[in-house]
A protein has these predicted regions:
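A structural-propensity feature for long, helix-poor, extended segments
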Residues: 466-514, 582, 820, 824-830
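Short acidic, S/G/P-rich loop/turn micro-motifs used as interaction or catalytic elements
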Residues: 34-39, 71-73, 85-96, 120-122, ...
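Non-catalytic signal-transmission and effector/linker regions of two-component phosphorelay proteins
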Residues: 1-66, 130-137, 141-220, 227-228, ...
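Hydrophobic/aromatic residues positioned on beta-strands within the core alpha/beta folds
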Residues: 116-118, 280, 300
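Conserved mixed alpha/beta core segments that line enzyme active sites in large multi-domain catalysts
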Residues: 417-456, 505-905, 922-925, 949-983
Length: 984
């Protein structure tokens, strides 16, 4: 069984269709008398005929024709412009066309030259006696513009075949024919058929752009006019040969050989390659040679020759329907129309039929003809004798299709087609407008995941949730049809606006599309805003509009009503009071805002009447609060059990650096773990069927405790257990004892590589966006196997908060300009609204008074809370230490209004800095800066003398409070851990 492919080791990469057909004919030089060119154009322009021909076949880039009448004019044009093809017509008045072609070839050896001539016996004799060494091809003009297209495509195929076959495995159809008149007739038929088939197969592509690109992967046609040329082309492209069409009689060793086609067929068959062969002949008796070669036969004299050729190619080369035959009777068993049809029917194919078609490479040819190269390459090398059980072969074909479809669907914004959207579809759009900010972000994520398949591991898939975006043009239609702008832009309250929107009707064409989406998505659906401004690189609009979650309802019309109401409620949120106020504050106009809607499966699992994921998270590629061995560029992540609303609302999350997942401050001591870890979480209430929508988009979410999660069985693999008897925290889940959300199996024991995946995604995201990024994600563990999980990327956005933009080099700021400066700073940004500094007087400092100092600070902080003002707090030792000999033992509520906290060492009071660890969660949640200063050893600067010279607002035995007339400026560079407090 060693020959059976292992799909786990196989990574399908998307075919780079954009890199195919790179060499094209854009300009054609036509050398002909005015009369000949008139005959060629048939009283119309060649450009127009070619354009019409291209358009009818969905081809792009039709070439432009430039007509000249003499060799001199031709050379002049060639000198001044680039041409990719020269077409000559005989009967030039002043010089023989063949001599002229030879002269042109001397100067321009790389430009193909084609002679196009009306045919007669006289012309045939003349050509037979001419030196054709300068001519690439001679064609017989029969008055059809399809020949011009065939000539252009033949030359383009010749130019591109070496690169395109080598890079992705584009297939070759070889036509062997020496009759000028015959191949001038056959090639247009052949090209038209191949192009029409490719156009039809391209409909399986997901959008117009993909369809156009996929046409580039069509089989190329090569023309051989003698035996030696046929063998050379075959040998060059034998591994990419889709099929061969050969005449029986043509030149061999310089003479006409009536059996040359048969001999060439024998040459092909001796290679052992299974290649369809069609033998053509004007003598019907030659069909016996075709039978000997196991080839099809076509009578060239048949009046139905074009139809016969089309039929044979359809049957033998993999075009058209895949007809599954009974190998014994050759009766049709079933017909397979496309990829999805094959996926559905592959397990219905009888064993003997499967062996018959696999052994003859019919399956690989089915894929090759449709430019589906990755699965074709695998199936081409399958040896059916390796399979003792044909169900394994069926499963291989099925799994190949699934893997291929998933690969094709990832990273592509498909046009939503209700009959094609299924469980393997990933991202589609309804409408022609914008996707909005979230929609664009999701599309970008999908493309990024596709470009980096190594993000995934065997037990940890990386994906985006199944998504459909309702574009902004649907919003426009909804607003205008229902005449909602007057109430939306007026002064109505939020509840009134929502009521009007819920009464309105969505465009009727959405109904069937939504119904089809419900059939595919088996989980609850998130209805998310995706406005034009949201998640913009320069517009921090995240979280301004509503997101509703809708439980899965089995009755489809109830589901339709609920999702429709959610869509309308999201539309209404554009015009709520807070949205309008935010628009004004950010200098945006409300009537310029447009809303797309993201419909997305909610990540998670069902636990009784609740639905939530194993974890939700937010991660940033920059960490402005690095501690220990962490660096700013290592990034930071916050994760929590349940829905992401808990994180957005500022809940207690587990915070770690993806590059240091074993060093988690919250788990560093038992006291921290018990006090600073998550105890509540959000879940979707599946019993709340949203009978009446509320302005509050969280109306059907419930906040639960860890005991609820424990009862529902969702904690087993993500917690540690506190043993109160032994006073220890044990890794893992044990009966009894308090459960602590440590995610220890994932972060410390690497059950699946969350930290490494986050690190890679943040690095790649920053690289792709060209700036630091923030991502939202969710992880859901496989309920049947806790070692497997799926990581879902929900959003990516650049970090654009203005306070986090720091271009100044703070190391250049002189000490005399500052009250404080530090080279050990946590936090980032510029604070410009603080006028007050509270500092512990160092002159008579004694650590035995630290408890009294804490009381005084609490009292002062209370007055700042009442005034809703902030201040800078400076003092010696570790702030928040439970040991009052090491620092002032304040709790967070005692200093909650401090905007910057400073640990200042003294010559006679040297304590290792705490880096704010005692209330680290509060520092990071509220963006508070933390400075460490040790002036006595040249580490930082504190100008206490300057503060002592300022009048005090309040002064106690231990503290002094100074207020400046104007705000002081505080600057923190979290990337370099530098910070200054400037003098006013």
């Amino acid at each position: 069984m060693s020959g059976i492919p292992n799909l786990k080791d196989l990574v399908f990469r998307d075919t780079p269709f954009a890199n195919l057909m790179n060499k094209r004919i854009y300009n054609v030089l036509l050398i002909a008398t005015k009369y000949d060119s008139f005959m060629l154009e048939d009283d119309g322009r060649v450009d127009e005929q070619i354009f019409n021909e291209y358009t009818s076949l969905s081809l792009r880039y039709p070439p432009r024709f430039t007509q000249v009448t003499t060799e001199e004019e031709a050379l002049n044009e060639l000198k001044n412009r680039n041409f990719e093809l020269i077409i000559c017509m005989p009967n030039m008045d002043n010089r023989d066309i063949f001599a002229a072609a030879s002269e042109i070839k001397v100067h321009y050896p790389n430009i193909p030259i084609v002679v196009l001539t009306p045919f007669s016996k006289e012309v045939s004799k003349r050509i037979a006696n001419e030196d054709l060494s300068a001519i690439d091809y001679v064609f017989s003009w029969l008055g059809n513009s399809e020949l011009l297209l065939a000539i252009i495509k033949l030359i383009e195929d010749k130019m591109n075949a070496p690169d395109d076959t080598a890079s992705v495995g584009v297939q070759i159809i070889l036509l062997v024919e020496d009759s000028i008149r015959f191949y001038s007739s056959a090639l247009p038929h052949l090209y038209k058929f191949v192009l029409e088939q490719s156009q039809m197969f391209a409909k399986e592509a997901l959008n117009d752009h993909q369809r156009t690109l996929r046409m580039r992967g069509r089989p190329k046609i090569k023309l051989a006019r003698n035996y030696e040329e046929a063998v050379r082309i075959f040998d060059q492209y034998r591994d990419n040969m889709l099929g061969i069409i050969s005449d029986m009689s043509f030149m061999h060793n310089g003479v006409k050989d009536p059996y040359a086609g048969y001999k060439f067929g024998q040459y092909v068959r001796k290679t052992g390659l299974i290649i369809p062969f069609v033998l053509e002949s004007s003598e019907a008796s030659n069909h016996v040679y075709a039978k000997e070669l196991n080839a099809s036969f076509i009578d060239k004299n048949s009046k139905s020759y074009p139809q016969d050729l089309k039929k044979k190619i359809m049957q033998r080369f993999g075009f058209g329907d895949f007809v599954i035959l009974n190998p014994h009777t050759k009766e049709e068993i079933m017909r397979i129309k496309d990829l999805k049809d094959l996926q559905k029917k592959v397990f219905q194919i009888p064993d003997d039929s499967l062996v018959y078609h696999l052994s003859r490479n019919h399956f690989s040819r089915f894929f090759y003809s449709r430019a589906m190269f990755p699965p074709a390459e695998v199936l081409k090398h399958v040896d059916v004798s390796d399979y003792k059980d044909m169900d394994e072969a069926r499963k291989l074909i099925f799994d190949l299709i699934v893997q291929y479809r998933r690969m094709k669907n990832t990273g592509v914004v498909a046009v939503y087609q209700k009959d094609r959207f299924d469980e393997y579809s990933n991202f589609a759009r309804i409408g022609d407008g914008s996707l909005g900010g979230k929609g664009r972000g999701l599309a970008f994520i999908g493309a990024m995941v596709k470009r980096y398949p190594k993000l995934e591991s065997d037990n940890f898939a990386v994906n985006i949730p199944k998504t459909v975006v309702i574009c902004t043009d649907i919003f426009d239609e909804f607003m205008e049809t229902n005449e909602l702008y007057p109430v939306a832009l007026g002064d109505a309250d939020d509840e009134t606006i929502l009521r009007y929107f819920l009464r309105a009707s969505l465009p009727s064409r959405l109904i069937e599309d939504l119904m089809a989406f419900f059939d595919v998505v088996k989980s609850p659906i998130a209805v998310r805003s995706s406005s034009l401004l949201e998640d913009s690189h320069y517009q921090p609009f995240a979280g301004i509009y509503s997101t509703y979650m809708v439980p899965k309802i089995e009755e489809k019309y109830d589901m339709l009503r609920t999702v429709s109401d959610a869509i309308k409620a999201v539309y209404a949120s554009v015009f709520y009071k807070d949205s309008k106020a935010y628009m004004t504050a950010t200098s945006n106009l409300i009537d310029q805002e447009k809303m797309a809607i993201v419909l997305q499966e909610v990540v998670g699992s069902r636990y009784n009447d609740h639905f939530y994921p194993t974890m939700s998270g937010v991660a940033r590629s920059l960490n402005f609060y690095p501690i220990g061995n962490e660096k700013a560029e290592d990034g930071i992540a916050n994760i929590a059990l349940g829905l992401g609303k808990y994180i957005v609302d500022g809940g207690q999350t587990l915070r770690f650096s993806p590059r240091h997942p074993h060093s988690i401050l919250q788990m560093s001591t038992m006291d921290f773990a018990l006090r600073e870890t998550q105890t509540r979480f959000y879940a979707l209430d599946l019993k709340n069927m949203a009978e009446a929508f509320s302005v509050d988009d969280a109306f059907n979410l419930v906040k639960l405790g860890l005991k609820d999660a424990d009862a529902e069985g969702s904690l087993k693999y993500i917690v540690s257990t506190y043993d109160p008897y032994d006073q220890i925290i044990r890794d893992g889940y044990y009966p009894g004892g308090r459960k602590i959300l440590s995610f220890v199996n994932i972060l410390q024991h690497d059950v699946f590589p969350l930290a490494d995946t986050l690190d890679q995604i943040l690095r790649i995201g920053q690289q792709e966006m060209g700036r630091p990024v923030e991502i939202e994600f969710a992880v859901n563990m496989d309920p049947s196997d806790h070692t497997r999980a799926t990581f879902y990327l929900l959003q990516i956005r650049p970090i654009v908060d203005n306070k986090e933009i720091m271009d100044e080099d703070l190391s250049l700021v002189k000490n005399e300009e500052t009250i404080l400066s530090s080279t050990s700073v946590l936090g980032h940004g510029i604070v410009g609204d603080v006028q007050d500094i509270i500092y512990v007087k160092t002159g008579a400092f004694n650590s035995s008074n630290n408890q009294l100092i804490a009381y005084e600070i609490e009292k002062m902080n209370r007055s700042f809370t009442n005034q809703e003002k902030g201040y800078v707090l400076v003092g010696p030792g570790r702030w928040g230490s439970s040991d009052s000999w090491l620092g002032i033992p304040v709790k967070w509520p005692h200093i909650s209004n401090a905007r910057v906290i400073v640990e200042c060492g003294l010559e006679n009071y040297r304590v290792d800095p705490s880096q704010g660890t005692h209330f680290f969660q509060n520092l990071t949640s509220f963006g508070v800066g933390y400075f460490t200063v040790n002036p006595f050893k040249g580490d930082g600067w504190f100008d206490e003398a300057f503060l002592n010279a300022q009048p005090a607002v309040e002064e106690t035995e231990y503290l002094r409070h100074v207020r400046f007339d104007a705000p002081i400026t505080i600057k923190m560079d979290g990337k370099k851990s530098l910070g200054v407090v400037l003098k006013p």
